[in-house]
C-alpha cells in the first residue's frame, strides 16, 4: 500500500460519512507504511487522535489493529482562516498547549501521540465565497494580510523550536509564502498539494523543501497535461512525495467523490507513469523520503 503524507481522517469520517474502519483496515491489509493525519485548528489534535483511537478499537483483528497504530501519525497546525488570523496570539498558545500535551502523554502503546509535524499552515489567496470555507477577498484587508503572514511565521518559528517539519499550505500566494519562509529562515518540510509551476518549484527545492502532489495532477486537460508531466519529472527523486488531502481532491477516475487515503494509489500511478518508473518504485522512493524528512 502506498504511503499518504496528507489526509484529514476526522473530517472524512465524521463530516463526510466515510467508513473509517474500512479505510484503515484496507490500508493495513495492503501494508501501508505511513499515513499522516493533518491538523487545521489550534485545538483539534486531541479530538483527531481520539477519532482514530475509537476506530482502531473497532478492529477485531489484533494484528491488524497493531498495524494501523504503527503507521498512523499526526501533525498539528492552524489553517489560515480569518478568525484564526485575527486571534493569532491566543491561537498559538492553544496550539502549543495541545502539542505539549501530546508530547507528555503517557499512553504511547496504541498510537503515535507525539506530533511529528507542524501544520498545515500557510497562505491562501484563492477566493471562493460559495465554497465550504467561504473565503472572500473582501475579508482580506491590510491588517488581515499582515495577520495571515504573522500566523504562518509564528508556526514556522514553533516548528524550528520543536525541531519538526512544516506542512505548508500555499494557494495563489507563492510570493507571500516565500517571503514568510525567508523571513523566518526555516526550510524543513513539505509544500503540500503543490499547485505552482517549475520556476516556483525550483525556488522551494533550492531552499530544501519537499514537494507533495495530490489528486489534482490527474485533472488536467490535454492543453496542460504536458506541463504537469514536465513538473512531475522536474522534482528530484529525493524530494518527491504523494498525498490525497482526503476527503478533498479525489483523483481521476474518482473525481467528485469523497476522497480517502486508499485512493492515493491513483496519484502514484499517474506520477510514476509521467516519471518513467513504476508505482512500486515510486512508492519505495516516497517511503525513503518520509523516513528522512520525519526522522523515522
Regions from the PLM with identified roles:
Residues 1-296:
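Mid-domain alpha/beta scaffold segments of enzyme catalytic cores
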Amino acid at each position: 500500500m502506498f504511503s499518504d503524507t496528507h489526509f484529514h481522517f476526522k473530517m472524512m469520517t465524521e463530516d463526510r460519512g466515510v467508513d473509517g474502519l474500512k479505510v484503515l483496515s484496507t490500508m493495513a491489509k495492503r501494508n501501508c507504511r505511513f499515513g499522516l493525519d493533518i491538523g487545521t485548528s489550534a485545538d483539534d489534535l486531541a479530538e483527531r487522535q481520539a477519532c482514530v483511537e475509537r476506530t482502531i478499537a473497532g478492529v477485531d483483528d489484533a494484528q491488524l489493529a497493531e498495524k494501523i497504530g504503527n503507521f498512523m501519525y499526526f501533525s498539528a497546525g492552524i489553517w489560515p482562516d480569518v478568525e484564526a488570523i485575527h486571534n493569532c496570539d491566543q491561537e498559538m498558545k492553544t496550539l502549543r498547549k495541545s502539542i505539549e500535551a501530546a508530547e507528555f502523554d503517557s499512553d504511547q502503546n496504541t498510537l503515535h501521540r507525539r506530533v511529528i509535524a507542524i501544520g498545515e499552515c500557510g497562505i491562501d489567496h484563492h477566493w471562493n465565497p460559495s465554497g465550504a470555507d467561504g473565503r472572500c477577498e473582501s475579508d482580506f484587508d491590510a491588517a488581515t494580510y499582515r495577520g495571515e503572514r504573522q500566523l504562518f511565521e509564528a508556526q514556522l518559528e514553533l516548528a524550528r523550536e520543536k525541531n519538526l517539519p512544516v506542512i505548508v499550505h500555499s494557494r495563489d500566494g507563492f510570493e507571500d509564502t516565500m517571503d514568510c519562509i525567508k523571513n523566518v529562515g526555516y526550510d524543513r518540510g513539505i509544500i503540500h498539494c503543490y499547485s505552482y509551476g517549475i520556476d516556483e518549484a525550483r525556488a522551494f527545492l533550492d531552499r530544501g523543501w519537499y514537494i507533495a502532489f495530490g489528486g489534482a495532477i490527474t485533472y488536467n486537460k490535454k492543453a496542460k497535461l504536458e506541463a504537469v508531466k514536465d513538473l512531475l519529472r522536474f522534482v528530484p527523486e529525493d524530494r518527491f512525495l504523494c498525498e490525497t488531502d482526503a476527503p478533498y481532491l479525489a483523483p481521476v477516475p474518482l473525481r467528485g467523490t469523497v476522497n480517502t487515503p486508499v485512493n492515493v494509489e491513483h496519484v502514484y500511478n499517474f506520477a510514476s507513469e509521467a516519471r518513467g518508473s513504476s508505482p512500486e518504485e515510486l512508492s519505495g522512493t516516497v517511503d525513503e523520503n518520509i523516513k528522512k524528512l520525519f526522522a523515522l
